[in-house]
Amino acid sequence: MSELILKCEGVGKRYRDGGLDVRVLHGLDLEIHAGESTGIIGSSGSGKSTLLHILGGLDMPSEGRVLLMGEDLRTLNQRRLGDLRNRHLGFVYQFHHLLPEFSALENVMMPLLIGKKSREEAAEAAMAMLEKVGLKHRSTHRAGELSGGERQRAAIARALVTQPKCLLADEPTGNLDRANARNVLDMMLELKTELGTGLVVVTHDDELAGRFERVMVMKDGSLHPKQGANA
């Protein structure tokens, strides 16, 4: 069995809405291992993105716990939580969130500079990752000069440049046409295999989700394996 990266134990989430107690997630159990790809599908509002935020330590469960590399995220102070998250997790969203005033190379360097790498080390690692996503020749271009697919590739390069244990992606192909969506997903799966990174992708697209080794369905705040899925 490959290395266990993330583990959910009885995770629930509820919010107060006026005088109402709104439950979003119900007693979820989930394990994410290195090199494993997991797709999470479900209708809008089913709790997919909430779960991803909790897995990433961006939100905390109301019940249960999440372990990242064996550490219970609820017990950590903000500094330790941020350090653990930055070291072991990468994030990709539907919108690329590239900084428009910087080049593709500078955007990909950013997590390494935040992590106190020298500019020389950061530039070398960022260029190597841009080459892996097929953007080395576009490294000096700003976000506005890149196509939609190129911007998302740059965002994925930025998420992977720190070599995280797991990449969490929320609708990463949602703003792309079908051809670009397939290309971006192909690249993510190739890099997952090459780098040994765990991959968790939230998507509404059943066809794309079918490419993952494991597909889970979120319905009414509960998570179940998809019938007929590969794993």
UniProtKB/Swiss-Prot annotation:
It is found in: Cell inner membrane. ATP binds at G42, S43, S44, G45, S46, G47, K48, S49. GO terms for cellular component: plasma membrane. The keyword Mitochondrion does not apply. Its EC number is 7.6.2.-. Pfam families: ABC_tran. Disulfide bonds: none annotated. Signal peptide: none annotated. Keywords: ATP-binding, Cell inner membrane, Cell membrane, Membrane, Nucleotide-binding, Translocase, Transport. It is an enzyme of class 7 (translocase). Its main location: membrane. One of its GO terms (molecular function) is ATP binding. It is a peripheral membrane protein. GO terms for biological process: lipoprotein localization to membrane. It comes from the Bacteria. The keyword Transport applies. InterPro entries: AAA+_ATPase, ABC_transporter-like_ATP-bd, ABC_transporter-like_CS, ABC_transpr_LolD-like, LolD_lipo_ATP-bd, MacB-like_ATP-bd, P-loop_NTPase. Residues 6-231 form the ABC transporter domain. Part of the ABC transporter complex LolCDE involved in the translocation of mature outer membrane-directed lipoproteins, from the inner membrane to the periplasmic chaperone, LolA. Responsible for the formation of the LolA-lipoprotein complex in an ATP-dependent manner. The complex is composed of two ATP-binding proteins (LolD) and two transmembrane proteins (LolC and LolE). Belongs to the ABC transporter superfamily. Lipoprotein translocase (TC 3.A.1.125) family. This is Lipoprotein-releasing system ATP-binding protein LolD.
